[in-house]
Amino acid sequence: MKNTDKKIAVFSNYKPQSKEVCQLLIKKLRQNRFILTDKNPDIVISVGGDGMLLSVFHKYEKQLDKVRFVGVHTGHLGFYTDYRDFEIDKLIDNLKLDTGAQVSYPILNVRIFLEDGSVKTKLALNEATIKRSDRTMVADVMINHVAFERFRGDGISVSTPTGSTAYNKSLGGAVLHPTIEALQIAEVASLNNRVYRTLGSSIIVPKKDKIEIFPTRNDQHTISVDNRTYTFKHIAKVEFQIDNHKIHFVASPSHTSFWNRVKDAFIGEVDDEI
């Protein structure tokens, strides 16, 4: 595909540095004869941080089979970004050499079944979390049609492999490599005593298994899907499963390996004497 055939959409957050980088990037893309359009793009470039990339993911979540993403970070290293703000020229050069290769990560499908029979479907790149709005949540958890436990606590989070480094990690969950197509269940402040017991640790669930959560109260619950929050009453159950689609990133020599992202985000440089 020639530069003049590639349709590219560019988005940034509202921070001055991101807007400045975005304007420079758009200028250089035009100089190199790329087509700039938000409608049915081949490549979507996010300028900002992981939060911005989550936003553009949801903007194009119905076109995942046709779109590849690129992240440009204007702060600290992000998990979904391959370029820093001072690497715009490198990004342009790699886009000119782009062959259509991609790096793909699994995403989460969330189905919310309401008592009136309606079903709401959401997609998550990082995680989805269900909580009762103002009281302790009580819910039955079923894994692959096995009644697993009755949960009592603040909520339950289900994350993707790439999302395992986000909210899931702060809940004490494990970090999963994205080539492991599995979901992870993490408890949010569970109640554990002589009367009420849960497993008390995160659970890795394989791709083929379905996670079902049945709230025992029909009052108001909140369901957070990445950086979006929804409120529902009268939830019959919520299903979590790996979606049939994946998110695709532009593969390039600059694509940072997952373990390098983890190291840079949480550990930093390792002492050579170790």
From Swiss-Prot:
The highest taxon in the source lineage is Bacteria
Which Gene3D superfamilies does the annotation name? Probable inorganic polyphosphate/atp-NAD kinase, domain 1, Probable inorganic polyphosphate/atp-NAD kinase, domain 2
What SUPFAM superfamilies is this protein classified in? NAD kinase/diacylglycerol kinase-like (SSF111331)
Q: Where in the cell is it found?
A: Cytoplasm
Q: What chemistry does it catalyse, as a reaction equation?
A: NAD(+) + ATP = ADP + NADP(+) + H(+)
Alphabetically, the GO molecular function entries are: ATP binding; metal ion binding; NAD binding; NAD+ kinase activity
**GO cellular component terms, A-Z:** cytoplasm
| Pfam family name, one | NAD_kinase
Question: What is this protein's function per UniProt?
Answer: Involved in the regulation of the intracellular balance of NAD and NADP, and is a key enzyme in the biosynthesis of NADP. Catalyzes specifically the phosphorylation on 2'-hydroxyl of the adenosine moiety of NAD to yield NADP.
Of which family is this protein a member? Belongs to the NAD kinase family.
Q: What is this protein called?
A: NAD kinase
Q: What's the source species for this entry?
A: Streptococcus gordonii (strain Challis / ATCC 35105 / BCRC 15272 / CH1 / DL1 / V288)
Upper taxonomic classification of the species? Bacteria, Bacillati, Bacillota, Bacilli, Lactobacillales
Q: Which gene encodes it?
A: nadK
